[in-house]
Regions:
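Small-residue-rich hydrophobic membrane-insertion segments
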Residues: 53-131
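Cytosol/matrix-facing juxtamembrane amphipathic
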Residues: 2-55, 106-170
Length: 170
């Protein structure tokens, strides 16, 4: 499985990329989304006000995310799903998807190291982390998916590049 990541400059391009993954049969549990808290507020404001704490695994979150999915963007629904997202106010980040579970496992004391370790463990080269960190700081949205096949990986890479993604890594 190849990890495909891309940094999207705006909500529309990120939503289109997220939708392309779900249209290919990937679930929100397989799609990672990382953005700043300011970006979440800017693009998803009142629709994504449900905040989670590190390690909070409330089961009802999945139902909330699914119920909200029809009334707002797919990314906002993923953020709202308590069981699959983290809001890290001290770092100003919002993380949704399997990466959130990996970071939650680090516990509150290891969150900062957990994020860096999880991103590296996720397969993002260390030299690319700086590009993503700056892009997220500047309001971008990072999306990543572990492609199930080489064909899926090529499709993600092509679709995301055509959809204004920066720093697409396969």
């Amino acid at each position: 499985m190849s990890l495909i990541t891309g940094l999207f400059k705006d909500q529309n391009s990120a939503e289109t990329a997220y939708k392309s993954a779900t249209d290919m049969g990937y679930s929100s549990d397989e799609i990672n989304v990382v953005m700043s808290e300011d970006t979440r507020k800017k693009y998803y404001g009142k629709d994504a006000t449900l905040e989670t704490e590190v390690g909070n695994k409330a089961a009802e979150g999945a139902a909330i995310g699914g119920a909200l999915g029809g009334t707002m963007g797919a990314i906002a629904a993923a953020i709202a799903a308590v069981g699959t997202s983290l809001v890290l106010p001290g770092l100003g980040l919002v993380i949704a998807g399997p990466l959130a579970a990996a970071i939650a496992g680090a516990g509150a004391g290891g969150v900062t190291a957990g994020i860096v370790g999880a991103l590296i463990g996720w397969g993002i080269p260390e030299d690319r982390l700086k590009d993503y960190e700056q892009g997220i700081h500047d309001g971008g949205i990072l999306i990543g998916v572990k492609a199930r096949s080489d064909d899926d990986a090529r499709r993600f890479e092509n679709d995301w590049k055509q959809n204004s993604a920066d720093h697409v890594t396969a």
